[in-house]
């Protein structure tokens, strides 16, 4: 004999096992679907036996009219049924919500790639900016305007600028040489890729030091401002238009709040650009860039539990294109700042 608790779990229409409240009544899946289908029809069913048919788990299919009437008597409401369009929209939103709540898993190969990039980055660029102080910076660059007492006499700003930029490029070269996939390419292509991407990688990594509040670069105890770049040489500095473009890029990228794996993958995408002048193995390099891009996409999607911009990947692609323009303008600027290119033969070679 069924207990009171069992009866409460049964469908109020046919007595089958209920799955929940549907359209305001506790019903089974069968009666839920029947009610939705029947009410959606323009013509209702009729009973040939004066509405006296039994509606049970076994007999429920015999008379749609009596079954519908019992649904209504049990409290099921027609006004709670969504239209086909509304139902499709709700299901689509539910599917989208499930997709967003389920982080995309990185493959083993992608995990290994990220670890390789992070390892090379840590070894060669992890403490790069803290070392700028060894290049005898002018006193005004210090955040507290107090140079360290152990420093040798300072050199002009242009000399310090040349030294730190050469140092950054050297570290970028070490970073790339630490990547097995880069070393596997012909030496000619390695040179072409480095000449094209070295400055871009410098700016991607430098972005981690950019302070949105002050619009300065904070490198260890040093602070670099837009005014410093404008007066890097006693005679002339970087053009204001170029600096505004550069600082806008850094502000936009910094606001995206990238994680370290996203920074290194972005740098790798810049490195493996198959359209650099002089590249011969374009197909192989294109495949490498696609691998970096897919890994970056997967990583971003895997972080969806964090409040991230859903257009983040698209924005990063746009910033890479913007960085390409900055790179070209930077090369022109270097050549036209008096005395600067002669102090930086490595960077002059990169930008030539």
UniProtKB/Swiss-Prot annotation:
Residues 109-352 form the NR LBD domain. One of its GO terms (cellular component) is cytoskeleton. A zinc finger (NR C4-type) spans 11-31, 47-71. Pfam families: Hormone_recep, zf-C4. CDD domains: NR_DBD_VDR_like, NR_LBD_PXR_like. Residues 8-83 bind DNA. The modification Phosphothreonine is found at residue 38. Its main location: nucleus. Keywords: Activator, Cytoplasm, Cytoskeleton, DNA-binding, Metal-binding, Nucleus, Phosphoprotein, Receptor, Transcription, Transcription regulation, Zinc, Zinc-finger. Phosphorylated at Thr-38 by PKC, dephosphorylation of Thr-38 is required for nuclear translocation and activation. It is found in: Nucleus; Cytoplasm; Cytoplasm, Cytoskeleton. GO terms for molecular function: estrogen response element binding; nuclear receptor activity; zinc ion binding. InterPro entries: NHR-like_dom_sf, Nucl_hrmn_rcpt_lig-bd, Nuclear_hormone_rcpt_NR1, Nuclear_hrmn_rcpt, ThyrH_rcpt, Znf_hrmn_rcpt, Znf_NHR/GATA. GO terms for biological process: regulation of transcription by RNA polymerase II. Heterodimer of NR1I3 and RXR. Interacts with PSMC4. Interacts with ECT2. Directly interacts with DNAJC7; this complex may also include HSP90. Interacts with CRY1. Interacts with CRY2 in a ligand-dependent manner. PANTHER family: NUCLEAR HORMONE RECEPTOR, NUCLEAR RECEPTOR SUBFAMILY 1 GROUP I MEMBER 3. Binds and transactivates the retinoic acid response elements that control expression of the retinoic acid receptor beta 2 and alcohol dehydrogenase 3 genes. Transactivates both the phenobarbital responsive element module of the human CYP2B6 gene and the CYP3A4 xenobiotic response element. Composed by a short N-terminal domain followed by the DNA binding, hinge, and ligand binding/dimerization domains. Belongs to the nuclear hormone receptor family. NR1 subfamily. This is Nuclear receptor subfamily 1 group I member 3. The lineage of its organism: Eukaryota, Metazoa, Chordata, Craniata, Vertebrata. The gene is NR1I3.
């Amino acid at each position: 004999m069924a207990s009171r608790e069992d009866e409460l779990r049964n469908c109020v229409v046919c007595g089958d096992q209920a799955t929940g409240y549907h359209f305001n009544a506790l019903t089974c899946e069968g009666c839920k679907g029947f009610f939705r289908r029947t009410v959606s029809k323009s013509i209702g069913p009729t009973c040939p036996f004066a509405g006296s048919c039994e509606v049970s788990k076994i007999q429920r299919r015999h008379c749609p009219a009596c079954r519908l009437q019992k649904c209504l008597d049990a409290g099921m409401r027609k006004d709670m049924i969504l239209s086909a369009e509304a139902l499709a929209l709700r299901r689509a939103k539910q599917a989208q919500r499930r997709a967003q709540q389920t982080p995309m898993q990185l493959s083993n190969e992608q995990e290994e790639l990220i670890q390789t990039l992070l390892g090379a980055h840590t070894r060669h660029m992890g403490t790069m900016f803290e070392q700028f102080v060894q290049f005898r910076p002018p006193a005004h660059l210090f955040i507290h305007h107090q140079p360290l007492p152990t420093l040798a006499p300072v050199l002009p700003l242009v000399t310090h600028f040349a030294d730190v930029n050469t140092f950054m490029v050297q570290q970028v070269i070490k970073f790339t040489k630490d990547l097995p996939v880069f070393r596997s390419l012909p030496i000619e292509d390695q040179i072409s890729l480095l000449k094209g991407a070295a400055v871009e990688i410098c700016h991607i990594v430098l972005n981690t030091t950019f302070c949105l509040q002050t619009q300065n670069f904070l490198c260890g105890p040093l602070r670099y401002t837009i005014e410093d770049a404008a007066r890097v040489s006693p005679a002339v500095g970087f053009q204001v238009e170029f600096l505004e473009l550069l600082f806008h890029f850094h502000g936009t990228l910094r606001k995206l709040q990238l994680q370290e794996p996203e920074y290194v993958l972005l740098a790798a995408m810049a490195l493996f650009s198959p359209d650099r002048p002089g590249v011969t193995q374009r197909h192989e390099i294109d495949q490498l860039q696609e691998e970096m891009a897919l890994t970056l996409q997967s990583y971003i999607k895997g972080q969806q539990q964090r409040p991230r911009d859903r257009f983040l990947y698209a924005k990063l692609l746009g910033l890479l294109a913007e960085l390409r323009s900055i790179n070209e303008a930077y090369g022109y600027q270097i050549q036209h700042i008096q005395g600067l290119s002669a102090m930086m033969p490595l960077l002059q070679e990169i930008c030539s």
